[in-house]
């Protein structure tokens, strides 16, 4: 914990094409070694592929996909009298978004398509159809929280 009081969160600027802060956060998650231009190109190309395949606004599709992969519950380890319990907790909205974006990018990188733009668009399209690695990760997280519901009274 910081000694000098609360540290405020740094606000991100909306991206230039879609005007969305969530897209900027996606770009930042895709970015490697500070190469933001390449990350932007990957994301915008992925959005073009989505527009081509669905015929819908890619931002709308992306928001829908994010809603499908953002977790509502997660488990946190809590030590009580020598035993460690997995205690189900609600996820804060900012953490929900961060986890959703992280899972989306991580599982995009693990896919088999040739280029990252194809992998990212594929994972987003899978997420709106309730499929794909990121959606499965959310479901697993929820199952884990449900299985440990008995320890919910250890919440803090």
From Swiss-Prot:
Part of the 30S ribosomal subunit. Contacts proteins S9 and S11. It holds the Pfam family Ribosomal_S7. One of the primary rRNA binding proteins, it binds directly to 16S rRNA where it nucleates assembly of the head domain of the 30S subunit. Is located at the subunit interface close to the decoding center, probably blocks exit of the E-site tRNA. One of its GO terms (cellular component) is small ribosomal subunit. InterPro entries: Ribosomal_uS7 (IPR000235), Ribosomal_uS7_bac/org-type (IPR005717), Ribosomal_uS7_CS (IPR020606), Ribosomal_uS7_dom (IPR023798), Ribosomal_uS7_dom_sf (IPR036823). It comes from Ruminiclostridium cellulolyticum (strain ATCC 35319 / DSM 5812 / JCM 6584 / H10). Keywords: Ribonucleoprotein, Ribosomal protein, RNA-binding, rRNA-binding, tRNA-binding. The keyword Transferase does not apply. GO terms for molecular function: rRNA binding; structural constituent of ribosome; tRNA binding. This is Small ribosomal subunit protein uS7. The keyword Transmembrane helix does not apply. It comes from the Bacteria. NCBIfam families: rpsG_bact. One of its GO terms (biological process) is translation. Belongs to the universal ribosomal protein uS7 family. The lineage of its organism: Bacteria, Bacillati, Bacillota, Clostridia, Eubacteriales.
């Amino acid at each position: 914990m910081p000694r000098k009081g609360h540290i405020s969160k740094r606000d991100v600027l909306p991206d230039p094409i879609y005007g969305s802060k969530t897209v900027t956060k996606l770009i930042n998650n895709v970015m490697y070694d500070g190469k933001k231009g390449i990350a932007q190109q990957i994301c915008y190309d992925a959005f073009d592929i989505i527009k081509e395949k669905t015929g819908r606004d890619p931002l709308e599709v992306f928001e829908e996909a994010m809603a499908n992969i953002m977790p509502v519950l997660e488990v946190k380890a809590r030590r009580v009298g020598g035993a460690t319990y997995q205690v189900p907790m609600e996820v804060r909205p900012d953490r929900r978004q961060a986890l959703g974006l992280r899972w989306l990018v991580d599982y995009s990188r693990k896919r088999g398509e040739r280029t990252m733009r194809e992998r990212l668009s594929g994972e987003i399209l899978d997420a709106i159809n309730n499929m794909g690695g990121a959606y499965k990760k959310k479901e697993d997280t929820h199952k884990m929280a449900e299985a440990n519901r008995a320890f919910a009274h250890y919440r803090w």
